[in-house]
């Protein structure tokens, strides 16, 4: 089921399901208990979070609860992460709510370059490929604590040290945590 929560609230109770079905819900704010009440038939029910980059066959797909058929399906188009309980899955839903914020960072940096006289195509190519490379580096190093990359990317009195210090002073990273907490609170009703 891939509809908005408002549409889901309206239509799910009117749909007919069979007990032999496996139902996958992409609906962010309707939990498993609510879905089961709306569906009224005992089915295999899984919540999943496939984000737009899955169209490129890239990215994680958290699923809850674990389900072999659903995992095998999503492993063909991404990287499935099985979450044992719904309470923990809310953390993944919360972080997925930061996708637009990530794109806005890219937009702000590209726009800044454009205002400095760089052609839009060059600005966007530079920023997007820079962040792609940084993300790939983070994936390669994902078994290490990510603070390692923060430390390794700075040189004493260097530009990255300055950038990190300025953003830390302004509470940028605390704001990220506060935003995640607000999204989590909305989902954890």
Provide a role label for each language-model segment.
Residues 34-44, 59-93, 97-143, 182-187:
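Internal alpha-helical scaffold of NAD(P)-dependent oxidoreductase catalytic cores
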Residues 3, 7, 27, 97, ...:
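Short coil/turn residues that cap or connect secondary-structure elements
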């Amino acid at each position: 089921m891939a509809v908005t929560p408002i549409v889901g609230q309206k239509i799910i109770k009117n749909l007919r399901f069979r007990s032999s079905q496996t139902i996958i819900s992409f609906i962010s704010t309707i939990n498993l208990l609510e879905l089961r009440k709306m569906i009224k038939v005992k089915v295999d029910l899984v919540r999943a979070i496939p984000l737009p980059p899955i169209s490129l066959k890239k990215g994680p797909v958290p699923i809850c609860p674990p389900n072999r058929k659903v995992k095998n399906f999503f492993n063909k188009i991404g990287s499935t992460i099985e979450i044992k309980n719904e309470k923990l899955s809310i953390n993944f839903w919360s972080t997925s709510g930061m996708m637009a914020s990530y794109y806005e960072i890219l937009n702000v940096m590209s726009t800044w370059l454009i205002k400095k006289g760089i052609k839009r195509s060059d600005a966007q190519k530079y920023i997007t490929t820079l962040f792609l490379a940084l993300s790939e580096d983070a994936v390669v190093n994902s078994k290490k604590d990510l603070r390692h990359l923060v430390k390794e990317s700075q040189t004493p009195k260097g530009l990255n040290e300055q950038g990190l210090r300025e953003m830390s002073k302004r509470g940028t990273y605390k704001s990220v945590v506060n935003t995640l907490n607000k999204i989590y609170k909305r989902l954890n009703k």
